[in-house]
Curated annotation (Swiss-Prot):
Membrane-spanning parts: 7-26, 114-134, 159-175
Residues exposed to the Lumenal side: 1-6, 135-158
Gene Ontology molecular function: protein-membrane adaptor activity
GO biological process terms held by the UniProt record: tail-anchored membrane protein insertion into ER membrane; vesicle-mediated transport
GO cellular component, one term: GET complex
Organism of provenance: Meyerozyma guilliermondii (strain ATCC 6260 / CBS 566 / DSM 6381 / JCM 1539 / NBRC 10279 / NRRL Y-324) (Yeast)
The keyword Cell wall biogenesis/degradation is assigned to this record: no
Origin superkingdom: Eukaryota
The protein's name: Golgi to ER traffic protein 1
Entry keyword set: Coiled coil, Endoplasmic reticulum, ER-Golgi transport, Golgi apparatus, Membrane, Transmembrane, Transmembrane helix, Transport
Length: 200
């Protein structure tokens, strides 16, 4: 891989990593689950489709049961009540199964986040640890600085991948902060407490 490609690729990964950090892993998991719930029934996910159907039936039965007097139409009310209890039990069982699916979706989302952010960083850090991304002209920087930006495995005068990762991470963090700052909740202005006569 060419050095300039590494430069761009690492910077993009750092941007994605900062965006994920700003949005929050839990928010991404929630979005993933909502998308899964919308898409899965279209591909024959029986649990979600059955749960939606039974929930609709439960609302219908509950409405009919409320409209029937237990004293005047006891047999009909009892039948509706049994249907109601049966549907509630079935929905609870389906909910447990759906909760297990949610755990699987969240686990998959976590793996996907790791694949997109952490794993590439460690791979490049090991595989391209001695690659010089670019050079500074000799004498333009102090000798100690030239030596430090080449750490840990690059020749003096060159910029190592590790240093570029830190620089790209800092820039990505600053850009994310500047973008997210207008959307942050306003901090209330502090009010000075009035001093009592005894404190004066």
């Amino acid at each position: 891989m060419e050095p300039y490609t590494l430069l761009l690729f690492i910077f993009v990964i750092q941007i994605v990593k900062q965006i994920i950090s700003a949005v929050g892993k839990q928010s991404i998991e929630s979005i993933s689950w909502v998308l899964y719930c919308r898409v899965a029934p279209k591909f024959g996910h029986s649990k979600l489709a059955s749960m939606s159907q039974k929930s609709s039936q439960l609302r219908t039965v509950a409405g009919e049961r409320r409209a029937v007097s237990a004293q005047d139409q006891y047999a009909k009310w009892t039948k509706l009540n049994r249907q109601h209890d049966k549907l509630v039990a079935e929905i609870e069982q389906l909910q447990k199964e759906v909760d297990l699916d949610k755990v699987k979706v969240n686990t998959f989302t976590g793996y996907l986040i790791a694949i997109l952010t952490s794993i590439p960083i460690w791979f490049f850090r090991v595989w391209y640890r001695s690659v010089v991304l670019f050079y500074f002209p000799p004498g333009i920087l102090p000798r100690a600085l030239e030596w430090s930006i080449a750490l840990p495995f690059t020749v003096t005068g060159g910029v190592s991948l590790t240093v570029w990762m830190m620089a790209a991470g800092a820039v990505a963090s600053s850009l994310t902060f500047l973008f997210m700052f207008p959307f942050e909740k306003a901090v209330p202005k502090p009010v000075l407490a009035k001093k009592s006569p005894q404190q004066l």
